[in-house]
């Protein structure tokens, strides 16, 4: 590249970023309209051409951009043979629970040939979020970024970056993911690992037939860049790093944090993280790498990293790419180190006087096979059927909209008896019952727990070792929560240390392998909200429950009527 080309590219990069900011930087709230056509395309990856489900024929899907307090209206048209819904991960949906998106929880799926219009405000929210399908495992390819910028008069609480880029970390399967989920359910065994990791849909040169399938960012030397990281994967937690560059975390799950600088980060599925990177190295090409964090034992997983390029403008074509170094796949210390560094930017109002205490165990189960065909043997441990649970209750997905049943006071579809503590107390991590499949059974049910509006809630999530303990990404719809503590082993109220001054405010928490995590939040959003593990396989197996927040005394504290075009089951 000639020296005269460098300033031209410099000006172009800055101009594009400025136009993007100007486009959303108007004064006052706006209404932003989008149309999502859910449709299949033929896509070639890893030496094979397969049919995948996309939005607007894009993989990854289109970006949604808005400004704090804007209204977003998205008409979703389902042009595929599969049912679908869209969830707006991290958007609280204040008084708009009907548009949250999880299938059979807040709505019936959008059936083939049908449409549904989502309509909600991003009230008092800004930052990096994610939209994705919330039916079966379709979010393997149906996902994209949802970026909410601060109001025009509100600056970032850090130095304004020269430019920004969105980095979507994904998993790619060559098989049809809807059929794959069905096969896993029928077999009772574990799922196969993804065929590749991807960065913005590209696997990079470590995979077959992928030497040219490499995402690349053009970087101006000595400038500061904001990278919006999103883990859109469905069954894997992942590390991310850039060769020879330091990453400064400034936001997680749409909430500002105190700046924390590290060499690598780990994101659980559904988590978002904004990082600042300074282009302070010698002009050249540097690897951005994504690789697995797998804390469970005896689990098959994809262990080939995805690679993208962080390329300085002015680098020569024959420059050797500087390789990035990822942690080993089970580096629990690297994960804890990053988590220890997360603090809310300012002092926060953590609930002190708690109205409801919950203790929820999370883990895997092995149920008896109970195959209808005696010749078909289940492929779980000791020929059992793998399951998952919260407080040993394995969630059974209904075939109606639970929110609609709750609103219309229909009986027989769910119960209000989800236990606030496990039935039995034992050494959850080390002494779990493991006589498969006699004492690893889970009870089945579609159960919820009810909170009064404004209740102050504390939940202890306790990892269990019934089969294997691992880092579980637990996501709460409709609310964010303060992560006030976490640790290894069994939770002990006498020794647990809580941060009540500046804990991070998240919507998805990785409950540590062989450990526990404590959260607090105020139940101030009326409706019915899903709590679940964000590994799709664990949600498929039943690691979910539901929180019902009752109406308050005022109209603005109450769930509105359902929309007229709400899909039918």
Curated annotation (Swiss-Prot):
Binds 4 Cu cations per monomer. It catalyses: 4 hydroquinone + O2 = 4 benzosemiquinone + 2 H2O. InterPro entries: Cu-oxidase-like_N, Cu-oxidase_2nd, Cu-oxidase_C, Cu-oxidase_fam, Cu_oxidase_CS, Cu_oxidase_Cu_BS, Cupredoxin, CuRO_1_LCC. Predominantly expressed in the inflorescence stem, but not in siliques. Residues 1-29 form the signal peptide. One of its GO terms (molecular function) is copper ion binding. Its cofactor is Cu cation. Pfam families: Cu-oxidase, Cu-oxidase_2, Cu-oxidase_3. It is found in: Secreted, Extracellular space, Apoplast. Cu cation 3 binds at residues 134, 477, 532. Glycans are attached at residues 83, 208, 303, 319, 392, 438, 444. Cu cation 1 binds at residues 87, 475. One of its GO terms (biological process) is lignin catabolic process. Cu cation 4 binds at residues 472, 533, 538, 543. Its main location: secreted. One of its GO terms (cellular component) is apoplast. Belongs to the multicopper oxidase family. NCBIfam families: laccase. This is Laccase-6. It comes from Arabidopsis thaliana (Mouse-ear cress). The gene is LAC6.
């Amino acid at each position: 590249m000639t020296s005269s080309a460098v300033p031209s590219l410099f000006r172009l990069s800055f101009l594009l970023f400025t136009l993007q900011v100007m486009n959303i930087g108007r004064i006052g709230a706006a209404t932003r309209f989008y149309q999502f056509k859910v449709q299949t395309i033929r896509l070639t990856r890893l030496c094979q051409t397969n049919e995948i489900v996309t939005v607007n024929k894009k993989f990854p899907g289109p970006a949604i951009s808005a400004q704090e307090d804007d209204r977003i209206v998205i008409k979703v048209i389902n042009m595929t043979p599969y049912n679908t819904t869209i969830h707006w991960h991290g958007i609280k949906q204040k008084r708009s629970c009907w548009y949250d998106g999880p299938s059979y929880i807040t709505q019936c799926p959008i059936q083939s040939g049908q449409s549904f219009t989502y309509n909600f405000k991003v009230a008092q929210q800004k930052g990096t979020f994610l939209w994705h399908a919330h039916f079966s495992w379709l979010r393997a390819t149906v996902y994209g970024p949802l970026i909410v910028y601060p109001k025009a008069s509100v600056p970032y609480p850090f130095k304004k970056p020269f430019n920004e880029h969105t980095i979507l970390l994904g998993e790619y399967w060559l098989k049809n993911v809807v059929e794959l989920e069905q096969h896993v359910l029928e077999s009772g065994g574990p799922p196969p690992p993804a065929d590749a990791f991807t960065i913005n849909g590209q696997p990079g040169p470590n995979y077959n037939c992928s030497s040219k399938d490499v995402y690349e960012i053009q970087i101006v030397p000595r400038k500061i860049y904001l990278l919006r990281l999103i883990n859109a994967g469905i069954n894997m937690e992942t590390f991310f790093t850039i060769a020879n560059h330091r990453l400064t975390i400034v936001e997680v799950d749409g909430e500002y944090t105190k700046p924390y600088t590290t060499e690598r980060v780990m994101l659980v599925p559904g988590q978002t993280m904004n990082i600042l990177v300074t282009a302070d190295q010698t002009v050249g090409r540097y690897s951005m790498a994504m690789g697995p964090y797998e804390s469970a034992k005896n689990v098959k997983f994809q262990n080939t990293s995805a690679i993208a390029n962080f390329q300085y403008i002015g680098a020569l074509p024959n420059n050797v790419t500087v390789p990035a170094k990822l942690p080993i796949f089970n580096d629990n210390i690297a994960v804890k180190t990053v988590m220890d560094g997360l603090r809310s930017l300012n002092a926060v109002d953590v609930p002190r006087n708690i109205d409801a205490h919950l203790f929820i165990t999370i883990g895997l189960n092995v149920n008896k096979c109970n195959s209808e065909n005696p010749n078909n043997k289940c492929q779980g441990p000791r020929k059992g059927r793998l399951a998952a649970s919260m407080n040993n209750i394995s969630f059974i997905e209904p075939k109606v909209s639970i929110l609609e049943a709750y609103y219309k006071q229909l009986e027989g579809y769910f119960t209000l008896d989800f236990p606030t503590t496990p039935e039995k107390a034992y050494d959850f991590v080390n002494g779990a019952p493991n006589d498969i499949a006699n004492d690893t059974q889970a009870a089945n049910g579609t159960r919820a727990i009810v909170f009064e509006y404004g209740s102050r809630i504390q939940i202890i999530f306790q990892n269990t070792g019934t089969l294997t303990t691992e880092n579980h990404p637990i996501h709460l719809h409709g609310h964010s929560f303060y992560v006030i503590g976490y640790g290894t082993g069994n939770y002990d109220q006498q020794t647990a240390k809580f941060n009540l001054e500046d804990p991070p405010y998240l919507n998805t928490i990785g409950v540590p392998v062989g450990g526990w995590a404590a959260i607090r939040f105020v139940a101030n959003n009326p409706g019915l909200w899903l709590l679940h593990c964000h590994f799709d396989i664990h949600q498929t197996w039943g690691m979910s429950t539901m929180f019902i927040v009752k109406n308050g005394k005022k109209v603005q504290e109450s769930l509105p009527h359902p929309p007229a075009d709400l899909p039918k089951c």
